[in-house]
Amino acid sequence: MAVAAAAAAAGPAGAGGGRAQRSGLLEVLVRDRWHKVLVNLSEDALVLSSEEGAAAYNGIGTATNGSFCRGAGAGHPGAGGAQPPDSPAGVRTAFTDLPEQVPESISNQKRGVKVLKQELGGLGISIKGGKENKMPILISKIFKGLAADQTQALYVGDAILSVNGADLRDATHDEAVQALKRAGKEVLLEVKYMREATPYVKKGSPVSEIGWETPPPESPRLGGSTSDPPSSQSFSFHRDRKSIPLKMCYVTRSMALADPENRQLEIHSPDAKHTVILRSKDSATAQAWFSAIHSNVNDLLTRVIAEVREQLGKTGIAGSREIRHLGWLAEKVPGESKKQWKPALVVLTEKDLLIYDSMPRRKEAWFSPVHTYPLLATRLVHSGPGKGSPQAGVDLSFATRTGTRQGIETHLFRAETSRDLSHWTRSIVQGCHNSAELIAEISTACTYKNQECRLTIHYENGFSITTEPQEGAFPKTIIQSPYEKLKMSSDDGIRMLYLDFGGKDGEIQLDLHSCPKPIVFIIHSFLSAKITRLGLVA
């Protein structure tokens, strides 16, 4: 995960549209150095604006800016600026298109390159420079697979001299954007590779150095149409400013970077590849910033769930799995001696608890979670005092245990606020109970007294053990017992299940031929759901 850390000294806070709005002077940590930035929080974005002159930062003597050129001739502020060495594989930058890899024969030679714009993605380039920067218009990024990249004739560091014959050598940055926008579907670029411009293409303001990228423009936006206005949907960069969309970001504390002074907060990208860390002058201000950003992110969840449902259609994630709730949690990394956590996207459907490493963008990705646990075989086993919470003295963790054929699988999660903790624990418990009512009955093969049988557990009717029917015969019921008669249940953790209904035969021993834990957990879920339905627990 690329970590760009930002530090915050809070400014005035306000409210608008029912969501928190806030602005203030902050600091941003880029390549191990802190830099002041102005941070503005809106309903759906966090905007970082450079407060340090780009001239002092990159030695050019002027400010820098950048624009991404896309979409059927449309140009809008986009992923311009320098890119750290860990930039995603889908983007060519000055760190991937090294000067020594560019043929010497084209250096400082004018070339004509014809580019056919794509319906989605447009030219697929980012540009920097302009008359106001005393620099030519330079290609600073090329998105792989899009129009410019497909020509195999354009390079990061190419100066654009003209567009369809229109001279850009004395153009401002905005004039160049407009020229590219009006160029039509077939674009003839006159370019010249400038090795001496490589440092300029690489560097920008501290804000432009923050590693935060969205997928290439041709990727479908979550739940949105291809005609959605890009300005509010995608990451943007313009005149030393970056706007980070908050939708499905993960806002947390003390995960990517140690915070002994308790004055930092972290914003993780939906793809879990990048992190921005904000730091304030004191812990109280950090908490205020955290609460405001976290609140805005939470307010966007309803829209996200609706978009995911629309994206997945009637079938849901897989066979009528309707999404009931989703969101980010911190998950304890197993096997670590210290409390180390990682982001986990947790999704609750009508029947399952799903865990993803990142927010799926394409429909197919929803069908490949890292873990899938049936709620019927899952129980909440811990929610209360413990260690490792983001706020000193406050524990916000809970654990789940699931009975599987491999044994019991446990996950320890951490919520960010008490409200989040209550919502998640309530949703999981209710999900288990609803799943019990929805599924109503499970059965499994077993051996009882050396006879092949079938154990059936029904939500309403309790337990029954029947013989496996022989050809031409009906199954015979050996044991039928309601839940009220169950005195005790246990297992050996390997294959044996023990049930005691208080009858003359005493304890019943059933060989399930596999790990009994799923059945044990399902019995617990049925009992818990029935007790809750009867109002015996609050």
From Swiss-Prot:
Keyword annotations: Acetylation, Actin-binding, Calcium, Calmodulin-binding, Cell junction, Cell membrane, Cytoplasm, Cytoskeleton, Membrane, Phosphoprotein, Repeat
Region (Calmodulin-binding): 518-538
InterPro entries in alphabetical order: PDZ, PDZ_sf, PH-like_dom_sf, PH_domain, PHsplit_syntrophin, Syntrophin, Syntrophin_4th
Region Disordered: start-end pairs: 205-237
Protein topology in the membrane: Peripheral membrane protein
Record's subcellular location: Cell membrane, Sarcolemma; Cell junction; Cytoplasm, Cytoskeleton
Keyword tRNA-binding: no
Domain SU: 482-538
Phosphothreonine: modified positions: T214
Recorded GO MF terms: actin binding; calmodulin binding; PDZ domain binding; structural molecule activity
Domain PH stretches: 19-298, 322-433
Domain PDZ: 112-195
Domain notes: The PH 1 domain mediates the oligomerization in a calcium dependent manner.
The protein's name in its UniProt record: Beta-1-syntrophin
Organism: Homo sapiens (Human)
